[in-house]
Amino acid sequence: MKTLYSLRRFYHVETLFNGTLALTGRDQETTGFAWWAGNARLINLSGKLLGAHVAHAGLIVFWAGAMNLFEVAHFVPEKPMYEQGLILLPHLATLGWGVGPGGEVIDTFPYFVSGVLHLISSAVLGFGGIYHALLGPETLEESFPFFGYVWKDRNKMTTILGIHLILLGIGAFLLVFKALYFGGIYDTWAPGGGDVRKITNLTLSPSIIFGYLLKSPFGGEGWIVSVDDLEDIIGGHVWLGSICILGGIWHILTKPFAWARRALVWSGEAYLSYSLGALSVFGFIACCFVWFNNTAYPSEFYGPTGPEASQAQAFTFLVRDQRLGANVGSAQGPTGLGKYLMRSPTGEVIFGGETMRFWDLRAPWLEPLRGPNGLDLSRLKKDIQPWQERRSAEYMTHAPLGSLNSVGGVATEINAVNYVSPRSWLATSHFVLGFFLFVGHLWHAGRARAAAAGFEKGIDRDFEPVLSMTPLN
């Protein structure tokens, strides 16, 4: 085993001074951490830490499988997914499994298979986690040097980073292959109201793909969240997968440059803080994606977005009053602006009333009625199809505005359905988790930097309350 320095030197955070750093146990005497400090006891025990990570993966996959089967068991095909509190089946449906035209579920068997596969996988991971936590070697460096590591070994750390990047790249390409070769994925923009299709004409132009990154994050622009066709999404995954795999190979083959060795803190806690920071960013981006994007998260499965429900309400009443004889092109509303239609700041014809603020919504049921200058008056008079009316009435009554006690829908909409949209659940949970991960990032980054600077003492364990309490046994 390569020991680059004394272990005492390597672990700067000073905890209990018991004179030994024997890498045995699970107790406070040998590790300096009490049982409730969790994986801190395993900082120098690579074998045990492997067990903790594999067991954690097993718990995650077990939840996925069990929750998947729970949703299948409770699923009612006659109701939309978003009315049933489902968050996993919409993801499977978006990948094209079990659904047909219009997002109608025609076969639940693929969902059952997915749940069972995850349960079986979780059993394998659970066994591996228990094995490595209880029976396997405490450290991997001696017996399996390829899997062993020392936190300070910069070259080994970037090799591990490279392996992770390659795995992420393979994950991105799995979606690409599903969309191109294995049955396709669900396209909410398919003519007539959405269908499963294979993606044939990928967007690989770097100016388009990386153009998303250069967009403003604000309304009408919307950064990467504004993507609204599957060719761009799958093309983006080709780019991302390629970059991850090439970057992974690069990190495996190279050693960190001098500037990187100087700029970064190279300790286990520092790597933890970097990972938490990255996950926090992912959480915030996912929050915005599921809240605003109805292409990657089709409204047929997740329910309408907030702007979509609002625009659908305006559209529904335009249809109703036009049938009753209103001239929707010129009718004046209570504020003197157009009651049904008005102009946006840049001159497009948009829906009037309170929904004017959502004028940059794009949705598959609405786009056929647009012309070169926004909503086309002649199309609104002649071309509205029954499926567009049905869908907008459905979305109008299912705004993603439910609270925890489920007083759902727009307050002024008497037909609103009492439910909490999966968009609300997923956006809120990812925002909250993203925030907590960010706090964890700051906490561990601060500790890691202080330890590297040599002045982190940790909690003074002489006066720690738990030490003066009666032992549990």
UniProtKB/Swiss-Prot annotation:
It is a multi-pass membrane protein. GO terms for cellular component: chloroplast thylakoid membrane; photosystem II. It comes from the Eukaryota. Residues 1-14 form a propeptide. The modification Phosphothreonine is found at T15. Gene3D superfamilies: photosystem ii from thermosynechococcus elongatus. Keywords: Acetylation, Chlorophyll, Chloroplast, Chromophore, Manganese, Membrane, Metal-binding, Phosphoprotein, Photosynthesis, Photosystem II, Plastid, Thylakoid, Transmembrane, Transmembrane helix. [CaMn4O5] cluster binds at E367. Binds multiple chlorophylls and provides some of the ligands for the Ca-4Mn-5O cluster of the oxygen-evolving complex. It may also provide a ligand for a Cl- that is required for oxygen evolution. PSII binds additional chlorophylls, carotenoids and specific lipids. GO terms for molecular function: chlorophyll binding; electron transporter, transferring electrons within the cyclic electron transport pathway of photosynthesis activity; metal ion binding. The keyword DNA repair does not apply. GO terms for biological process: photosynthetic electron transport in photosystem II. The chain crosses the membrane at residues 69-93, 134-155, 178-200, 255-275, 291-312, 447-471. It is found in: Plastid, Chloroplast thylakoid membrane. The keyword rRNA-binding does not apply. The modification N-acetylthreonine is found at T15. One of the components of the core complex of photosystem II (PSII). It binds chlorophyll and helps catalyze the primary light-induced photochemical processes of PSII. PSII is a light-driven water:plastoquinone oxidoreductase, using light energy to abstract electrons from H(2)O, generating O(2) and a proton gradient subsequently used for ATP formation. PSII is composed of 1 copy each of membrane proteins PsbA, PsbB, PsbC, PsbD, PsbE, PsbF, PsbH, PsbI, PsbJ, PsbK, PsbL, PsbM, PsbT, PsbX, PsbY, PsbZ, Psb30/Ycf12, at least 3 peripheral proteins of the oxygen-evolving complex and a large number of cofactors. It forms dimeric complexes. Belongs to the PsbB/PsbC family. PsbC subfamily. This is Photosystem II CP43 reaction center protein. It comes from Glycine max (Soybean).
